[in-house]
Design a protein with these regions (language model features):
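Conserved Class I S-adenosyl-L-methionine
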Residues: 48, 181-246
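Short catalytic micro-motifs in class I SAM-dependent methyltransferases
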Residues: 107-111
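Short alpha-helix
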Residues: 161-175
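A conserved beta-strand element that flanks and buttresses the S-adenosyl-L-methionine
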Residues: 104
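A short glycine-rich, Lys/Arg-flanked "PGG" loop and its adjoining helix->strand segment in the class I
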Residues: 116-128
């Protein structure tokens, strides 16, 4: 039941209706890295390019987006045809050794079939002195999600999918990074409204594709009932920024 795979070419058709780039997340990444005008940056698992484009606009660096899904990259290209896009899995990157100054991935590592091999190949394409930032959620942060309240099976599924932050640091050190560290960040509280409800209705969160139909319908019923009752749902998302330094 929890081994369902996700067809991201199909998901791409609704992805931009329910998911947008996150300036606050990109800002936190930028606070941890120093980039020059000609720095080469790689966004691994860029999806429809939301954060790739935000990162490009916020810096003068040359940012490339990479994703395994052609459908996602098609959407990204529609938004900005100037951003280079590459279709490839994350564990066999089609780049020469020591190409990039900085690599980042946002909410991607739990989608990778072989996260250790992907981190190793990222290490290969990073230049000496470069860094990697993996934005993810710890198991504690997963438990604190609003989706975990209404769809409790999704927390169980995601704690199986997400390597915890100490494990990710281990991936980095095993791959050859000189050091690794993690920094937790709590986003500003937001009141959840129709956008959140529509995201759940459209299964815009990937973990909702991995729970049973019965569990999904029960959770959606409870969520819609909470909105109908006038309950104010306020949520402050927690993320962990795991850094590796080469």
């Amino acid at each position: 039941m929890y081994k369902k795979t996700i067809d991201y070419d199909k998901v791409s058709k609704i992805y931009d209706n329910v998911r947008v780039g996150d300036p606050e997340m990109v800002t936190q990444i930028l606070q941890g890295v120093s980039l020059e005008n000609d720095s080469l940056v790689l966004d691994v698992g860029c999806g429809t390019g939301n954060n790739t484009i935000l990162f490009t606009k916020a810096t003068n660096a040359k940012v490339t987006g990479l994703d395994i899904s052609y459908g996602m990259l098609e959407k990204a290209s529609e938004k900005d045809k100037q951003v280079p896009l590459v279709q490839s899995p994350a564990d066999t990157l089609p780049f020469s050794d020591e190409t990039f100054h900085f690599v980042f991935m946002t909410e991607v590592i739990h989608h990778l079939p072989g996260p250790q091999s992907s981190v190793y190949d990222i290490f290969r394409v990073l230049e000496t002195g470069g860094s990697l930032c993996i934005v993810t959620q710890s198991h504690t942060q997963i438990d604190g999600r609003m989706t975990s309240r209404f769809f409790p099976a999704s927390a169980r599924v995601d704690k199986e999918r997400y390597p915890d932050t100490d494990v990710i640091e281990g991936f980095m050190l095993k791959s050859g990074f000189d050091r690794a560290s993690s920094k937790e960040y709590q986003f500003r509280p937001t009141q959840l409204g129709e956008e959140y409800l529509n995201t759940a209705r459209n299964r815009g969160y990937s973990m909702l594709h991995k729970i049973s139909q019965e569990e999904y319908e029960q959770g959606l019923y409870a969520l819609e009932a909470a909105f109908a009752s006038g309950e104010k749902l306020t949520y402050s998302a927690g993320y962990t920024f795991v850094w590796g330094f080469k």
